[in-house]
Amino acid sequence: MASTDTISDMLTRIRNACAVRHSTTQVPTTKMTLSIAKVLKSEGFIEDYSETGEGINKMLVLTLKYKGKTRQPLINTLQRVSKPGLRVYSPSKKIPRVLGGIGIAIVSTSHGIMTDREARRQGIGGEILCYIW
């Protein structure tokens, strides 16, 4: 089934896969989901990602990361902030810190998708997509 909000769909699939301790999960590939996967990998929330399939059936396979013998997920919370019905924008000086810097906010800027720290460092504001910790 086609989803109109691919970011929420991606976050929900990751949240559900972490809840049942799956090692991988698949999400439909878009430029946005690919950029978010790059940020998640660079911040250490997922091990890796790869693309499978061709054309309209292209999927992004995310390899999730767990800690310890009990396999506790590294991602505790995924919270969507800006939604299709209510967009949330923030200038660079007012981008919120997530849990005092422990978590990250993923921001869509004119220079691409990046973390809140990168956006503040570059002095760029944008749309706050989600919080992850």
UniProtKB/Swiss-Prot annotation:
Print the keywords alphabetically. Answer: Ribonucleoprotein, Ribosomal protein, RNA-binding, rRNA-binding
Q: Does the keyword Ribosomal protein apply?
A: yes
Q: Quick one: signal sequence residues?
A: none
| Keyword Iron-sulfur belongs to the record | no
Any GO BP: translation
Q: Name one GO cellular component term.
A: cytosolic small ribosomal subunit
Where on the tree of life does the source sit, at the highest rank?
A: Bacteria
Gene3D superfamilies, alphabetically? Answer: 3.30.1370.30, 3.30.1490.10
| One Pfam family here | Ribosomal_S8
Cite the GO molecular-function annotations of the record.
rRNA binding; structural constituent of ribosome
UniProt record similarity statement: Belongs to the universal ribosomal protein uS8 family.
Protein task: One of the primary rRNA binding proteins, it binds directly to 16S rRNA central domain where it helps coordinate assembly of the platform of the 30S subunit.
What quaternary structure, including any partners, is listed in this protein's UniProt entry? Answer: Part of the 30S ribosomal subunit. Contacts proteins S5 and S12.
Q: What is this protein called?
A: Small ribosomal subunit protein uS8
Q: Give the source species.
A: Synechocystis sp. (strain ATCC 27184 / PCC 6803 / Kazusa)
Q: Which gene encodes it?
A: rpsH
